[in-house]
Amino acid sequence: MSEQTIKILVTAVLFLQGVAHGRAFFALLYQSMGRLPASWLPVRSWLLPSLSAKTVAGVASIFWLLSTLGFLAMGLSYWGLLLPPDLWSQLAVPSAIISTLGIILISGIWPGAPNRQLAILDTVIALIVNIAILVAQLWLHWPPQ
């Protein structure tokens, strides 16, 4: 695979991860304001089950906002657009960890998903991307500097 093809694929994955987290962030924002559409699954915390869904959504929205900004900045940086090209690798590990913590803290329910199957699918895809980022950065040290 050519270097340009890899660059396009990695940038696309980072942007899609950012957009997916952004969509989830807005779903959490709606839920924290008490505007949860009937078709969306409410988020809950296994760690603090006594918290209301609105409170959990408010707390979780912080994780998703930070993840959204991190993944979108990573995509811009990796592509070399508006941000220094080496910035993406500095954002990679923190963004993936914040995203993973957010997913774990709210029981793996992807915010804004219309049903449990899509919530699980969205969650699994996000976790796979997060794990791939962590493995690439921490274990493989990719891309080489």
Where are these regions (language model features)?
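Membrane-interface extramembranous regions
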Residues: 2-145
